[in-house]
Amino acid sequence: MSVLADAETLRQIAIFRNCDTVPLQIMAFTAERQEFSIGEDLMTQGKKARAAYVLLNGRVSLRENDQDVGVAEPGAFLGETAMIGAGPYSITATARDIVSTARISHELFLKVAKEYPDFGQAVLNNLSEKLYNSVRELDTIRVMLDKSRKFSDL
C-alpha cells in the first residue's frame, strides 16, 4: 500500500478521527511493517504492551482469558493503549491467515505527537470520548443488572 492509502486507513480508526493528514502520513510512512504467519501471536494477553497494530491484510483471532471474543479484519486497530502508554495487552491476537500489519510503537506515537501537538490533543480527545462512552455503557449494564436482581426477588 502507498503512504497515502495507509494514512487514509489510519484516518478511519476512531482515535485518529479529525486528525490532520500530515501526522497520519508520517505515522504511515514510519510505522514498521510486520508480517505474521498463520498461528503466530501478534500480542499476548498479560505481556508488556510495546506497540499497536493496524491490520492491513488477513484476519486475526481475538481471545481473552482463553475464550474466543472475536475476529479482527483489515482496518482493525489492535493494542491502541500500547501506543499511548505502558501496561499489559488485554487480549491475545493470533493470525488466522498470513497477516500484514503496520506496527505503531509508543515511541513513534510520542515523537509525532511532540512534533504535532494538535495531533496529540486530537488523539487524546478521541480517547477521552471513547472512555466516556464505555463508562456510560457500563452504567447502563449496571442499571439493567440491578433491575434484573430486583425482579428476581419477586
Where are these regions (language model features)?
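Cytosolic regulatory regions built on CNB/CRP/Popeye-like sensor folds
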Residues: 1-154
